[in-house]
């Protein structure tokens, strides 16, 4: 009987081949459709084994004689004949059985011949014969099928022993078959197809061959990814992974025989595997380096697109597969390695044990040569190095060296515990370094020099015994989203005209500074977070000129940005806060541009310019700092323009010890001390600023301070708008000083200066108060609408008053105390309210006019009968009324308030309508100078 009549075989392909032809099955993506499998011819290999070799997809046997296990150009392995229908006595035809599955098999029309399946969808192999061996199919062409013959057929049908075997037993049998036989079995029957494509069978084969415990996805050259079974689109990930990897050769410390793969090749040295692959141009260059420590005789030289990947049954494959060099560089990539791959391997260099035992020899060897764990050199060296652990235990040479325009790609690698530099990139080399960890190296984690320009992204560089990243001698580089921390010296050091880009990195917890730019270093540092460093977050020195933009610099144990030694740079749009010292320091003739920053909540000052520092400081917001918002001292002369300086816990802007510079168009407000303080020889120019809300006045000039204040608005300060005291001599010109809660300008303690063309109005006390031996010059000022006198001169002071206008002041235009003789020329005093004179005329106590908020100037007396002291003063009307008949004496014409009316004497004032308690009287408080010293 023809096998084609059996329902246990699938329909053959159109092409019919000779049964004697030797065939090998091929791999198909659809493991559930045996009719789609094809086969190819096999040539016996040396030693009697069948040799399977890689062939590019789509090539024919004629084009490539090396067609192998998974070729798609083979044919069906059996010679099959066409099926004939079963004839009946009544000349009715049975339905031809055209499908191998029960779902597609129609029922016969005759009861006398019925096919029974063992199970739905299960294919079977049997023949139908009578007792004499005559083929029943032929007999049925002319005779009727009898019941006895039908019973014989059923009895014979029950003899299908193979298909009646338990599935566990078949799985056990299949677990011993090689991949070639498994693929062949998949075309025998549906049941064989299911079992030969089961996960258990292919997983055991896969693990024995590759040692992996997770399927390795290898869709294209130099791309490898371990994927859990649930992430594979194919039905059998183990089988699919084997299809992708079966062309590879294996390197083991102790090569083993594996009979389950027809393509299996195993060597004990990487060099031998490389030589084998170079001889076969059609075979994929793929090497599996298995568990163990592999010690090459000399450097492993890679100048092709070979792929080398670690293979181990350990969860940590990388640490289980070690390539160790001891006499020379362990691994070198040169020209031709543009598409090479190296992954999941530990690479390390250790000195030869003989050299280690003889230190002198080791020292001489190190002086003569540099040794590396991995060396990538020359222009066309562009390997992909992935998930490797790299270290070097010699003091002369980096773990990784990239030079001479090489451009490798390192990804998910570690470079740890090296005795020298971690990664050394030089001589115009580039490359990509992503998701790497570089840590605990004796010298810098990364060296970049000689115009090298690598790309680092999402790397962690930490715990080094030196610098984290060191760029020097025109080195460049792009560092993005790296985490650089806990290095003994700076996180990043830029030197000798190096010019890197550092963007969106974190630089923190350095044992010294965060970023150190010196010796004409440059660089662009943008959108980084720089914090918790022991020294300054960023140091710029010795003619360096970096760009610092949009960074967060905070909680440093010293300052935020420190610029000295004639440093320059652009510091722009940064958020600098919470540092132990000044947010920005500029010293020793440095001249940066500082603009659009927020500098706030520091434990020290905001910006500190000293030791002849300069710089353009504009459009910054400086607030909430413990000490002065901006300090300018020791010969410094910065330009401070359009800044907003506010809410400080001391002074807004503080010039001292020969501090100079230009303070222009700034908003300075709401400080606990003065808005601006000038002292000890400082001589800034302060122009077009708005200064308000100072709790200790607007501007305080003292201790020999100078300065030129022009065109400013000084208003709404708790004390005087401008204080001039202790031998200070500023120039005030064209300012508007108004709405002060004390006087407009107060000049004390030998204060001098020139007040010219100012408008002083609506202040709570005198527009200008001159006292205690002071001698200023007032020229062409307008003092008006004051709630006290326009100008008051008292206590031994004098002044030169020229062409001033004093009008609409409450107590009078000009009030001069006894013994004061100012120089007056061309002043106009008019339309003042003269409230004091009117009160005297109407018999009012002057305290009724002034209360305890101001000090009217008039004749004041003391009463000897009431035992008043020199500190007490009584107005004229109280002497006439309350102390009539007492012994009194004139004190002087001066600024007092009436103690009788204030209720501070034992006698009750008869001129007060209601009793008053002894409120604390008010006097112009002494201005508070900053407690900050001259040293940080």
UniProtKB/Swiss-Prot annotation:
PROSITE patterns in alphabetical order: FBOX (PS50181), ZF_UBR (PS51157)
Biased composition annotated in UniProt, kind: Low complexity: 22-36
Transmembrane segments: none
Cellular compartments annotated: Nucleus; Cytoplasm
Record field: compositional bias (Polar residues): 48-63
One Gene Ontology term of the molecular function aspect: zinc ion binding
Gene disruption phenotype: Most mutants arrest as three-fold embryos that fail to hatch and those that hatch arrest in L1 with many animals appearing uncoordinated and misshapen. 7- to 8-fold increase in blmp-1 levels in seam and hypodermal cells.
Zinc finger boundaries on the chain: UBR-type: 843-914
Functional pathway: Protein modification; protein ubiquitination
Record keyword Amino-acid biosynthesis present: no
Domain F-box residues, every copy: 159-205
Expression by tissue: In mid-embryogenesis, expression is most prominent in epidermal and intestinal cells. By the 1.5-fold stage of embryogenesis, expression is additionally detected in neurons and other cells. During larval and adult stages, highest expression is seen in epidermal seam cells and hypodermis. In larvae, strongly expressed in the P epidermal blast cells and descendents that give rise to the vulva and weakly expressed in the somatic gonad, including the gonadoblasts, the anchor cell and the distal tip cells. Some weak expression also seen in adult spermatheca and uterus.
GO terms for cellular component: cytoplasm; nucleus
InterPro entries in the cross-refs: Beta_helix, Carb-bd_sugar_hydrolysis-dom, F-box-like_dom_sf, F-box_dom, FBXO11_UBR-box, Para_beta_helix_rpt-2, PbH1, Pectin_lyas_fold
PbH1 repeats: 405-427, 428-450, 451-473, 474-496, 497-519, 520-542, 543-565, 566-588, 589-611, 612-634, 635-657, 658-680, 681-703, 704-726, 727-749, 750-772, 773-795, 796-818
GO biological process: apoptotic process; embryo development ending in birth or egg hatching; gonad development; mesodermal cell migration; molting cycle, collagen and cuticulin-based cuticle; nematode larval development; positive regulation of apoptotic process; positive regulation of apoptotic process involved in development
Protein name: F-box protein dre-1
Lineage of the species this protein comes from: Eukaryota, Metazoa, Ecdysozoa, Nematoda, Chromadorea
